[in-house]
Amino acid sequence: SELQSVKIDGKEAVCKERSPKDIIHRMAVGVRHAGDDGSASFRIPGLVTSNKGTLLGVYDVRYNSSVDLQEYVDVGLSRSTDGGKTWEKMRLPLSFGEYDGLPAAQNGVGDPSILVDTQTNTIWVVAAWTHGMGNQRAWWSSHPGMDMYKTAQLVMAKSTDDGKTWSKPINITDQVKDPSWYFLLQGPGRGITMSDGTLVFPTQFIDSTRIPNAGIMYSKDRGKTWKMHNLARTNTTEAQVVEIEPGVLMLNMRDNRGGSRAVAITKDLGKTWTEHPSSRKALQEPVCMASLIHVGAKDNVLDKDILLFSNPNTTKGRNHITIKASLDGGVTWLPEHQLMLDEGEGWGYSCLTMIDRETIGILYESSAAHMTFQAVKLKDLIR
């Protein structure tokens, strides 16, 4: 049989025949599924590409259920050396197990963020560790103070062999937390190495009035010490950071006011912030984590300066996971530079990386698998 014509409201519509060669088949890989390695769920993706081209994906391993800390949670890592086609057996960069007389379910560590020091290829992972606190949500049961019995701890691990093995946990709480804050943790996803070698992670903290605020922390000495300055915007949480030009950082934030992303700029590592023209206007969101990366002109096949963004492209519900591109520094995100990957409902978190000069990689919480990976050609997004 053959389709001869199509009528819409009584009028004949123009039909264009397409060859099978014109159809783009974009396959996805289920990196983590419920039940893998005995874990009930996997959440909170982070993704980077090492200097050697290795893909390193991090996430929460939530053994008992999908709920947030406090629970039995470790930071897991999956490693791919073939562009995301296959993934090695899961590693655990951060895992406390039974500690200080309390079971693993009272020593959860999660919401990871991962960073590649591009000058040394040292890989850093930062996460929140909660000791005790019953089984209440750590967001509300962490308190002011500094020691592990009162407040969540900010811990790191590093790898110097391309993500194969990891150091013991490094506790940096004393370096960056204000004792009056209830909770300090990273912005899940990824951090960056600036053009001058400074390492930067996004952060979020609940202040003394119980209001959450996004910001950054940074290291000038290859990760030995870390500093924080001021918040970027009040009532914001999970954020991602990029360097849009030398010394200029953009922070893209989940905003509890709902509806759209907040965006701020700093030229002094977070001492002062200014609102970006796109803030609360250009990028809609359902109040959810999102991903943002900067791809310099010399680092991509199009020879253009590009910002890439991904999130659930909606204001209600976590669905329609979409990658968007901006060619003007994030001022506009044109419809022709958007690609929807998954219209189904899921948890909605995602993280982007460049696999090579031609290909975007995304690890996200899809409607089909807890951790789903897809590779997307840059030219499919920006034609």
Model-derived segments and spans:
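Exposed low-complexity, polar/acidic, P/S/T/G-rich flexible segments that act as propeptides
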Residues: 2-11
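Asp-box/BNR beta-propeller blade signature and adjacent active/binding-site loops
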Residues: 15-383
